[in-house]
Amino acid sequence: MEEEKKKSRVLIIGATGRLGNYLTRFSIESGHPTFALIRNTTLSDKLKSLSDAGVTLLKGSLEDEGSLAEAVSKVDVVISAIPSKHVLDQKLLVRVIKQAGSIKRFIPAEYGANPDKTQVSDLDHDFYSKKSEIRHMIESEGIPYTYICCGLFMRVLLPSLVQPGLQSPPTDKVTVFGDGNVKAVFVNDVDVAAFTIKTIDDPRTLNKTLYLSPPGNICSMNDLVELWEGKIEKKLEKTFATENQLLKKIKETPYPDNMEMVFIYSVFIKGDHTYFDIESCGGVNGTELYPDVKYMTVSEFLDTLL
């Protein structure tokens, strides 16, 4: 009976990043023996804080097979939270996990739109195809997995009310992309971490994609504008930008400066977060599985911008 209750041992890769730090803390708070792979053993304030919380720090990197193998041998679950630009650096990790043969679950660095469902492959400079490549490698190697798809972090697009180039929401005029009715999903990164840690020992999420689509966080541009107008008690002057106008702007703007607009095109024109049904494509809904997890709503996030 005691063995059944034993919590999985967890290795976090990318523990000093924003999401990785949240993941590490929730893992420890949930009672999982937690390890963090770190490049430098010199204790920064962040690392000291993790160590003081009970995290075991292991020196190593995604390029060093020996250190990876040693770290993987100590745990049951591996969670990667490395930045998207380094996503292909997980290839050696996948091979090491395969060779170890003892990992019960691998959660790769995704935490966005489902890369196999997005419709912007000609625009995104392989942003999503690299994530798909890691997925297909995991599955072809027969590694147990859970993928976390959370739409967009709230700190992406929302602080400007989806106005490219702005750092804060508009107070007079707003540009609405498309007809303004296509819905996107936004989740705060600390909440993404909380849901992710919940999946670790849950058989319902094994070899599944966990979608986070919290009620109150699925919003169209028209919804966002209406919410914001209510908070500032003022109507904004709306201008509508067509799909072709947005595409033209994306193509005229050099990479990576155009990626903000690529995300806007993906979610508010193509509907890449919401055009498919979660259950019918084999996914599971995080807010239904874990109704106890409290999360920030879009309205609450907009309150922080006032």
UniProtKB/Swiss-Prot annotation:
Location of the active site: K131 (proton acceptor)
Q: Subunit composition?
A: Dimer.
Q: Which InterPro entries match?
A: NAD(P)-bd_dom_sf, NmrA-like, NmrA-type/Isoflavone_red_sf, PCBER-like
Q: EC annotation?
A: 1.23.1.-
Question: Which residue stretches, if any, does this entry annotate as coiled coil?
Answer: none
Give, as one word, the top-level EC class: oxidoreductase
Gene encoding the protein: PLR3
- Functional summary from the UniProt entry: Probable reductase that might be involved in the reduction of lariciresinol into secoisolariciresinol. In most plant species, a single enzyme is able to reduce both pinoresinol and lariciresinol efficiently while in Arabidopsis, PRR1 and PRR2 show a strict substrate selectivity for pinoresinol.
Q: Which key words are in the record?
A: NADP, Oxidoreductase
Enumerate the Gene Ontology biological process terms.
positive regulation of leaf senescence; response to hydroperoxide
UniProt binding sites for NADP(+) = G14, A15, T16, G17, R18, L19, G20, R39, K46, R135
- Protein name in UniProt: Probable pinoresinol-lariciresinol reductase 3
Q: Which family does it belong to?
A: Belongs to the NmrA-type oxidoreductase family. Isoflavone reductase subfamily.
Pfam families linked: NmrA (PF05368)
**Gene3D superfamilies named in the record:** NAD(P)-binding Rossmann-like Domain, UDP-galactose 4-epimerase, domain 1
Show the GO MF annotations.
pinoresinol reductase activity
